[in-house]
């Protein structure tokens, strides 16, 4: 949607899943 908060939430989800695979000790997305 056009809601910035929704977009940030989606990106955070993807980032957390990705970083968990690459860096198990680092689960933020950023």
UniProtKB/Swiss-Prot annotation:
Gene Ontology CC: extracellular space
Keywords associated with the record: Chemotaxis, Cytokine, Heparin-binding, Secreted
Cysteine-cysteine disulfides: none
Keyword Disulfide bond: no
Post-translational modification: Binds non-covalently to a proteoglycan molecule.
Record lineage: Eukaryota, Metazoa, Chordata, Craniata, Vertebrata
GO-annotated biological processes: adenylate cyclase-activating G protein-coupled receptor signaling pathway; chemotaxis; positive regulation of transcription by RNA polymerase II; regulation of cell population proliferation
Protein name: Platelet factor 4
Family of this protein: Belongs to the intercrine alpha (chemokine CxC) family.
Main localization of the protein described in the UniProt heading: secreted
Job of this protein: Chemokine released during platelet aggregation that plays a role in different biological processes including hematopoiesis, cell proliferation, differentiation, and activation. Acts via different functional receptors including CCR1, CXCR3A or CXCR3B. Upon interaction with CXCR3A receptor, induces activated T-lymphocytes migration mediated via downstream Ras/extracellular signal-regulated kinase (ERK) signaling. Neutralizes the anticoagulant effect of heparin by binding more strongly to heparin than to the chondroitin-4-sulfate chains of the carrier molecule.
Subunit note: Homotetramer. Interacts with TNFAIP6 (via Link domain). Interacts with CCR1. Interacts with CXCR3.
Superkingdom field: Eukaryota
Subcellular location: Secreted
MF terms (GO), sorted A to Z: CXCR3 chemokine receptor binding; cytokine activity; heparin binding
Encoding gene (name): PF4
